[in-house]
Amino acid sequence: MQLIEKAPAKINLGLDTPYHHQDGAEEWNMVMTSVDLADYVEIQTLTKHKRIRVASDSGFLPNDQRNLAFQAAHLLQTNYGIDEGVNIRIKKNIPVAAGLGGGSSDAAAVLRGLNQLWSLGLSWQELAELGLQIDSDVPYCVYGRTAHVRGRGERITPLSKLPAAWVVLAKPKVSVSTPSILQQIQYDHLEHPDIDGLLRAIREQDIQGMCAVMGNALEPLTAHRYPEITQIKQQMMKFGADAAQMSGTGPTVFGLCSKQSRAQRVFNGMKGFCREVYLVRPLP
């Protein structure tokens, strides 16, 4: 049996980490939303053996245990005593190591897909709890849409859909290792964004209010290493974005626009600065 699961990219409208736990894991306080840039994950179950095979059309993606989609299949296979193998083929549209959650979204897609193909009957909450063993973004990616994410990534509160908005994504030519950024965190020196204010603006459908309080506590760490992030933000604002911010640990920057015509102008302008530029919309 086989099916295809859509694996949308995510952006962080707000990202804060107020402290870390004794085991070193970060405590997160984030507002995330899915956008209509997505990978497509084809999942085929195999009855002749238990091997897990991962393939993709990206030369930058590992196809072994380092791949989060592989880990998701192995986790379900091991936890539930499944005697079947899996072929996973990923059509990559989301840039790799970009701060857009592509790997986590692929893993979440495998969890959802195999839950169906193997008739496991797991709830999304149960899938999210399993996903936390893979990566802190996987629980959110199981649900998708717009959500408030707390804890180690497992506390997901769905939010109302965003007010009408368009998003321009621009990824510079660098790739960022998330662990290398997290290791640099000095909690006493972080600037904490107004997550409560962002949640209030979303509830009130106030896009200008959202733009005024958006923030990413990790942006200065990545931008210090890769100054092109700041340059991209400046260019987006120059071309007319209502707000511009780094997503995740970077390096992708997104510009939020309240009007489609303005977003198109930002998109056209940014194509002269970055090879990977996308004009997308938040998923409803």
Curated annotation (Swiss-Prot):
<dbReference type="Pfam" id="PF08544">
    <property type="entry name" value="GHMP_kinases_C"/>
</dbReference>
<dbReference type="GO" id="GO:0050515">
    <property type="term" value="F:4-(cytidine 5'-diphospho)-2-C-methyl-D-erythritol kinase activity"/>
</dbReference>
<comment type="similarity">
    <text>Belongs to the GHMP kinase family. IspE subfamily.</text>
</comment>
<comment type="function">
    <text>Catalyzes the phosphorylation of the position 2 hydroxy group of 4-diphosphocytidyl-2C-methyl-D-erythritol.</text>
</comment>
<dbReference type="InterPro" id="IPR014721">
    <property type="entry name" value="Ribsml_uS5_D2-typ_fold_subgr"/>
</dbReference>
<comment type="pathway">
    <text>Isoprenoid biosynthesis; isopentenyl diphosphate biosynthesis via DXP pathway; isopentenyl diphosphate from 1-deoxy-D-xylulose 5-phosphate: step 3/6.</text>
</comment>
<dbReference type="GO" id="GO:0016114">
    <property type="term" value="P:terpenoid biosynthetic process"/>
</dbReference>
<dbReference type="InterPro" id="IPR004424">
    <property type="entry name" value="IspE"/>
</dbReference>
<keyword id="KW-0067">ATP-binding</keyword>
<dbReference type="Pfam" id="PF00288">
    <property type="entry name" value="GHMP_kinases_N"/>
</dbReference>
<protein>
    <recommendedName>
        <fullName>4-diphosphocytidyl-2-C-methyl-D-erythritol kinase</fullName>
        <ecNumber>2.7.1.148</ecNumber>
    </recommendedName>
</protein>
<dbReference type="InterPro" id="IPR006204">
    <property type="entry name" value="GHMP_kinase_N_dom"/>
</dbReference>
<feature type="binding site">
    <location>
        <begin position="95"/>
        <end position="105"/>
    </location>
    <ligand>
        <name>ATP</name>
    </ligand>
</feature>
<dbReference type="InterPro" id="IPR020568">
    <property type="entry name" value="Ribosomal_Su5_D2-typ_SF"/>
</dbReference>
<dbReference type="GO" id="GO:0005524">
    <property type="term" value="F:ATP binding"/>
</dbReference>
<keyword id="KW-0808">Transferase</keyword>
<dbReference type="InterPro" id="IPR036554">
    <property type="entry name" value="GHMP_kinase_C_sf"/>
</dbReference>
<keyword id="KW-0414">Isoprene biosynthesis</keyword>
<feature type="active site">
    <location>
        <position position="137"/>
    </location>
</feature>
<keyword id="KW-0547">Nucleotide-binding</keyword>
<keyword id="KW-0418">Kinase</keyword>
<dbReference type="GO" id="GO:0019288">
    <property type="term" value="P:isopentenyl diphosphate biosynthetic process, methylerythritol 4-phosphate pathway"/>
</dbReference>
<feature type="active site">
    <location>
        <position position="10"/>
    </location>
</feature>
<dbReference type="InterPro" id="IPR013750">
    <property type="entry name" value="GHMP_kinase_C_dom"/>
</dbReference>
